[in-house]
Amino acid sequence: MKFRHSFMALALALAVTLPIGAEDLSFDEIYSGYDAEGLTFSDKTTSLEGGTVTISGYMAPPLTPTIHFFVLTEVPMSVCPFCSSDADWPDNIIVVKVDDPITALPYDTPITVTGTLEIGSETDEETGFVSQLRIRADAIDS
């Protein structure tokens, strides 16, 4: 009986923590390695395309204070990642698109993003920023 109560409490805690149908994705699961064309997506990442994912990280300093997208990084970045050379560009990032503009959060505030995973080249019309991997955010929690 005690086991059943513990199991039910654990199940309830997990149900409250993750949105229904959201699959956890971590930065170390996004890529499987490199090939002649650059980074290659992992089988897990490609299998989640079009599905709902949840990933945690940090909002990199954006191009403008009010934004329609931002770069989610695995570790806090105090400088603009767009101002670095290609050699300094981290491979543990993902673009997060939002429907309504949001105000940037402090770079060292941990956040969790839940939304639809998209794969494929897309260029932001306003900034010209090109992404290969995005999350269209349904929720951003800090």
Predicted stretch roles:
Residues 1-8:
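Bacterial N-terminal signal peptides that target proteins for export
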Residues 21-142:
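OB-fold and OB-like single-stranded nucleic-acid-recognition modules
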Residues 9-17:
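Bacterial N-terminal signal peptides
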